[in-house]
């Protein structure tokens, strides 16, 4: 599998993607017409609270990477350039990204590669289950790229992965972080009913006013409907969603989205700072100070969320096992 990071093609109509090629940076975002991303833009300097010292390489980090490579698997930690990778790998945890490492969407905030994906690896659910067993995990998060090329948008592959993990690791808790199953929401939930997870997660990402820029191809109401339908089918399974801040939204808009989530039955929330993966992605409009994250958490508690992890480096799967236990994560 190769990676393309080149500059914008001069004639977009003549540009044809090759199947299996991972398009990143300018090769990915230059065709998004919503907002002009200027690679020469002046970037905001990072404030003190956004500067962290990465831990040294460790045997655990190498072990997890080796385990992933050995089974031909992917972690969203690496593919999305997560800032918490070293911390999570050092703690022996990782979030598996199934259905390949090529996404059919090209969201300009995300560092996951875009392109024409390869066919599904039907052995992947078993490989994930075996890796979970090898790593002796008690809590695992499974996410995926968007697969708009599949009739069920990948729902059956999620269900198969949950089934295989549970069969081989009956004590392991499984959280799934799913895409929006565009146009197939009810069908997808019906498929997931066969092998329900312990936590159901779908990220809204940001506020509806900015959706066209931040999540081209997605729809705010569709995402809320997905969360609502799943909760109606499984009222006892926690539903969860995550937001990024610093993309130009206001705090008032974030609070409105939080209330929308509660109105649709969501009980768990994550809010973290957006970080620009490269100069070819949406720029950071603002670094939100820690005290504002504390405010979001307080408001979430007031609204009735059972758990809210809010902090600059919080991500959906960051210490997801602790989130599920209701412990403070920030």
Swiss-Prot record:
Name the UniProt record assigns to this protein: Lipoyl synthase
Keywords from the named record: 4Fe-4S, Cytoplasm, Iron, Iron-sulfur, Metal-binding, S-adenosyl-L-methionine, Transferase
InterPro entries, A to Z: Aldolase_TIM (IPR013785), Elp3/MiaA/NifB-like_rSAM (IPR006638), Lipoyl_synth (IPR003698), rSAM (IPR007197)
Pathway: Protein modification; protein lipoylation via endogenous pathway; protein N(6)-(lipoyl)lysine from octanoyl-[acyl-carrier-protein]: step 2/2
Similarity annotation: Belongs to the radical SAM superfamily. Lipoyl synthase family.
Residues that, per the record, bind [4Fe-4S] cluster 2: 103, 107, 110
Annotated localization: Cytoplasm
Any single Gene Ontology cellular-component annotation: cytoplasm
Domain Radical SAM core: 89-306
Reactions catalysed: [[Fe-S] cluster scaffold protein carrying a second [4Fe-4S](2+) cluster] + N(6)-octanoyl-L-lysyl-[protein] + 2 oxidized [2Fe-2S]-[ferredoxin] + 2 S-adenosyl-L-methionine + 4 H(+) = [[Fe-S] cluster scaffold protein] + N(6)-[(R)-dihydrolipoyl]-L-lysyl-[protein] + 4 Fe(3+) + 2 hydrogen sulfide + 2 5'-deoxyadenosine + 2 L-methionine + 2 reduced [2Fe-2S]-[ferredoxin]
Gene name of the encoded protein: lipA
Top-rank EC class of the record's enzyme: transferase
PROSITE patterns given in the database record: RADICAL_SAM
Cofactor remark: Binds 2 [4Fe-4S] clusters per subunit. One cluster is coordinated with 3 cysteines and an exchangeable S-adenosyl-L-methionine.
GO terms assigned for molecular function: 4 iron, 4 sulfur cluster binding; lipoate synthase activity; metal ion binding
Cofactor(s), names only, from the UniProt record: [4Fe-4S] cluster
CDD domains cross-referenced by the UniProt entry: Radical_SAM
Main location: cytoplasm
EC number in record: 2.8.1.8
Family annotation (Pfam families): Radical_SAM (PF04055)
Binding site for [4Fe-4S] cluster 1: 77, 82, 88, 317
């Amino acid at each position: 599998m190769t990676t393309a990071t080149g500059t914008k093609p001069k004639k977009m109509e003549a540009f044809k993607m090759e199947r299996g090629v991972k398009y990143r940076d300018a090769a990915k975002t230059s065709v998004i017409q919503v907002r002009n991303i200027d690679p020469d833009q002046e970037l905001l300097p990072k404030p003190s609270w956004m500067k962290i010292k990465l831990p040294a390489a460790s045997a655990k980090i190498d072990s997890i990477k080796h385990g992933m490579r050995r089974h031909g698997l992917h972690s969203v930690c690496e593919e999305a350039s997560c800032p918490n990778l070293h911390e999570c790998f050092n703690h022996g945890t990782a979030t598996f990204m199934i259905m390949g490492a090529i996404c059919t969407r090209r969201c300009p905030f995300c560092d996951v590669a875009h392109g024409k994906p390869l066919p599904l690896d039907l052995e992947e659910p078993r490989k994930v289950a075996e890796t979970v067993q090898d790593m002796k995990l008690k809590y695992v998060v499974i996410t995926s790229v968007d697969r708009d090329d599949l009739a069920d948008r990948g729902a059956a592959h999620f269900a198969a992965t949950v089934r295989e993990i549970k069969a081989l690791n009956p004590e392991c808790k499984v959280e799934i972080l799913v895409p929006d199953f565009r146009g197939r929401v009810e069908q997808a939930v019906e498929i997931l009913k066969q092998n329900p997870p312990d936590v159901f997660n779908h990220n809204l990402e940001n506020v509806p006013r900015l959706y066209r820029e931040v999540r081209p191809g997605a729809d705010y109401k569709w995402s809320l409907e997905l969360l609502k339908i799943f909760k109606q089918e499984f009222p006892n399974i926690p539903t969860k969603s995550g937001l990024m801040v610093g993309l130009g939204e206001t705090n008032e808009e974030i609070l409105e989205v939080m209330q929308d989530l509660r109105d649709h039955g969501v009980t768990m929330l994550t809010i973290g700072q957006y970080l620009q993966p490269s100069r070819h992605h949406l720029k950071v409009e603002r670094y939100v100070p820690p005290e504002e994250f504390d405010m979001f958490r307080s408001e979430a508690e007031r609204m009735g969320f059972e758990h809210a992890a809010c902090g600059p480096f919080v991500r959906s799967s960051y210490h997801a096992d602790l989130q599920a236990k209701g412990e403070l994560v920030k």
